[in-house]
Design a protein with these regions (language model features):
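PRPP-associated nucleotide enzymes
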Residues: 1-154
Length: 154
């Protein structure tokens, strides 16, 4: 549940004011699902004196809920921060999803900027699907990428 996730997240981040005061901080995480932990962590970093907070995410944005393993553990698409941003932009969380999954599209750029703005991040960058596949070392057809691009074949 969300309460337990929040508790675990707080135990993972123990800020040190002497190290953060007036500094530009780069914070890395594996993914952003709902954004709940991100909001709290960014606030803590600023509260402890960070001048800038930059975020780098190891995987591409989660655009689609996982129908296979429940990886995102979402009860619905609107739990995903990406879908909430898409709904704000388009008025429909299901509109033009393939454009929001394409890193070179204006829709993708706008969605990422909205997430950064929502959480007060100085900058936000996600790993690309292409770079992730390259790092894994298998052909894309052997890796499930459904939650990133909606493709379900592997």
């Amino acid at each position: 549940n969300q309460e337990m996730r929040s508790l675990v997240a707080k135990m993972k981040l123990i800020p040190n004011r002497a190290m953060l005061e007036g500094k530009r901080v780069l914070f890395c995480d594996d993914s952003i699902v709902r954004g709940t932990q991100l909001r709290d962590n960014v606030k803590i970093l600023y509260d402890y004196g960070a001048k800038e907070v930059h975020m780098r995410i190891a995987c591409p944005p989660l655009i689609y809920s996982c129908p296979f393993l429940g990886f995102t553990a979402s009860k619905g698409d609107l739990e995903l921060i990406t879908r909430r941003m898409i709904k704000e932009i388009e008025g429909d969380e299901n509109k033009d999803l393939e454009k929001y999954a394409a890193t070179d599209s204006p829709q993708y750029q706008k969605m990422v900027q909205m997430i950064a703005d929502r959480f007060g991040l100085t900058s936000l960058k996600f790993n690309t699907l292409e770079t992730l596949i390259e790092a894994i070392g298998l052909p894309k057809c052997k890796v499930c990428t459904h939650c990133f691009d909606g493709s379900s074949c592997f």
